[in-house]
Amino acid sequence: MKSIINLLAGSAIVLTMTTAAFADGNVIGVSWSNFQEERWKTDEAAMKAAIEANGDTYISADAQASAAKQLTDVESLIAQGANALVILSVDSGAVGAAVDKAAAEGIPVLGYDRLIEDDRAFYLTFDNKGVGRIIAETVKAVQPEGNYAIIKGDKGDPNALFLLEGMMEVIGADVEAGKIKIVGEAFTDGWKPDNAQKNMEQILTAADNKVDAVLAENDGMAGGVIAALSAQGLNIPVGGQDGDHAALNRVARGTQTVSVWKDARALGKAAGDIAAMLAEGKSMTEIPGAVKWSGGAKGVEMNAIFLDPTPITKDNINVVIDAGHIAKDKVCEGAMDGVNGC
């Protein structure tokens, strides 16, 4: 994980291809897990733009959080003539059948953001363990001890475990020493904010509201957590990630401590460019910036690219404004005093 490639917007590393190389054009099929979360729409726009800029055709399907539908979606994308597939998996355990279908047709696969632990798939994501570390470090700096709750993502998503591993690297020693006590920890079906809110409500009830900080594994769930806290009149440090617009506004308002921004535009563009190269017949080892990685649960060695995330707090809200990720009036609405950029 030390060989991390920074592909944020405006970075020096750009995956380039000539127009001539795509004179005939290829078809890039994208299987999305679901569009429930705000961020995937941003990813899609960037990915589609990159694919079309390369002279290729974008086709897609939305699995609507169903692993079974994702398999039929992949079959449909193959039938429509996809020359390469980008898959944001619903369930890491079930997606193998989709990879088998693609491999049988000689179609390369890019596992997008979520790990598909199969050496036939290229892996493109952010450094999710690093994201977990950043969330925990930022919250711990504000609340170095006391009762913590951890709201994890979906149990079937490897990212939930990578994020947790990163968090525990930061707070694990303090947990063992008794400085930090984990009073509640729960997986959240589908990463859904409503489910996260229910999980947090149950933790608050069990802990008699004695919770001092919350580590949430994404911004949508952080929103659910904060709703549960607000209902009890609590305002405590809460960390999340994705750089969702609503979360960034919560950071400015002071109800969320940090949102680790993973620039979806950079990830989407990189996916479009990598898929184009794979569709043209380049091997995974020929992808610029690719590294060998075997940090998954099964230890499978894979070709991967990891992008660097950026923590956003009240001290650097200006970063997302300056990058054009969110308008100043939107992020700064109701902002507390002392927010840099507002």
Explain the meaning of each model-derived region:
Residues 14-22:
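C-terminal segment of classical bacterial N-terminal signal peptides
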Residues 2-10, 14:
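Sec-dependent signal peptide recognition
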Residues 3-6, 21-342:
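A residue-level marker of the well-folded mature domains of exported/periplasmic proteins
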